[in-house]
Amino acid sequence: MGNAGQAKFYLQQAAKINPENEQITLALGKAHFATGDFQNSLNCFLTLQKKTFDDIDINYHIAMSYGRLNQQGESHYYFGLYFKNEKKKESALFHFRKALDYFPKGSVRAVAISDAIHELSADKPKKPDKKSDGQQNISR
């Protein structure tokens, strides 16, 4: 296993030379996380999200960083986004529901969470339809 502190040093140098390089920023965020510098880790990952970095794992890294910073509401929210992108509805719903406990009702974040819950819940009725189709086929 490599030395995360040394990697962080070299990645910081590379980031100074090429601050727009998303791969460097991602690697630097991971190095910050590995060395326990969770705030700078979070800052790197949020920068990538704002640049619409095309990596669904970014929500996972953001969630982990918020968790290490003991910001449970944000952590659950980003885990919800991660699992939603992974098409794991039950895990996404679990985290979104947990996140709601940390935000005031009517706040921008609470509304976004509620919208995500409703969107995921709206997909649920598709399962019973498949079962009823299967039952009709069995009885034939």
Please tell me what each predicted stretch does.
Residues 27-28, 61, 78, 95, ...:
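Canonical tetratricopeptide repeat
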Residues 85-140:
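Terminal, low-structured helical/coil segments at or just beyond the last alpha-helical repeat
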